[in-house]
Amino acid sequence: MDGSKHPSVFQKLHGQSYLINRLSPSVQARGYCVSGAYVNGGLQSLLQPTSHGVGSSLIPHGSFPVLAHAPSEKTGTGFLIDFLMGGVSAAVSKTAAAPIERVKLLIQNQDEMIKAGRLSEPYKGISDCFARTVKDEGMLALWRGNTANVIRYFPTQALNFAFKDYFKRLFNFKKEKDGYWKWFAGNLASGGAAGASSLLFVYSLDYARTRLANDAKAAKKGGQRQFNGMVDVYKKTIASDGIVGLYRGFNISCVGIVVYRGLYFGLYDSLKPVVLVDGLQDSFLASFLLGWGITIGAGLASYPIDTVRRRMMMTSGEAVKYKSSLQAFSQIVKNEGAKSLFKGAGANILRAVAGAGVLAGYDKLQLIVLGKKYGSGGG
């Protein structure tokens, strides 16, 4: 089959580095992917052309961070415009999907909330979580934690711009010269290294977002919240646990980058030449459905990692903590069953659809108004 007709995702995103979540995301994912875990931003690497100078990079999530989009190599005004417009696009997509994201986080972490006495009884499902949250906290509470999630985009993009050239030179394998597996391993390594480097700086924002989103009004504690806002999360966590409290779950998050990245791009490169043939090659719907299927599949496969890292985050400030990600994994499976690792996965799938739909519409609006598309963070 003619390789020029079916370029790999890395060829399409030539010159771009890949950073991680939530995890997240995002994954686009959106974004640890998948993050969400990495679901939200993953679709955009299929939907957005690179002729406009915008690539895609894995960022934790939210989901795990999902996926964030990096401006191409440019300086001055061009970079600033792409940077700011990408921020607007990220704010639009993240804010639109924020209610689903909060429900996902509440369902995913409800067992830790019950242990801490901050949730009276388990949620029965997505609709029950929506209804109880609105009833107990009000409609605006569905956006709790969204500010930290939107703010996270900007340092992520700046770090992406700073790290991408270094890791591009360090892991500069060519598929034609070095072979597929060496090229694939190099891309996994570069994505993991760049993702971990970026994550080191923005992880505390994802931590703050997670704690705020899971800060339901506690029935057993007089309806009081644990945190009064993002700054309060930092102050209370540092006071009780020190800086390390802001980075609980960091190691497993870095593993999640590589796992999601390998699944996503491995599936993409394998399925694209088989599925997108003939008339489907330029079909928006076909690309959308393929991207959605791949991000959902990779996101579900890596979702337990996102659950473990977020459950570890939830123990900062608590008397009993997990000693490691392996202990967290084994205790969750032993005490709650393996299905507990997938709590909130249904909401994560809905978030992927909502985020992708909003971004597709926003891309069209940008083309009409500004004559070009700008990238966004999907995580």
UniProtKB/Swiss-Prot annotation:
Species, as recorded: Arabidopsis thaliana
Keywords: Antiport, Membrane, Mitochondrion, Mitochondrion inner membrane, Repeat, Transit peptide, Transmembrane, Transmembrane helix, Transport
Gene: AAC3
Main location: mitochondrion
PANTHER family: ADP,ATP CARRIER PROTEIN 1-RELATED-RELATED, ADP_ATP TRANSLOCASE
Record text on activity regulation: The matrix-open state (m-state) is inhibited by the membrane-permeable bongkrekic acid (BKA). The cytoplasmic-open state (c-state) is inhibited by the membrane-impermeable toxic inhibitor carboxyatractyloside (CATR).
Motif stretch (Nucleotide carrier signature motif): 309-314
Name of this protein: ADP,ATP carrier protein 3, mitochondrial
Name of a matching Pfam family: Mito_carr
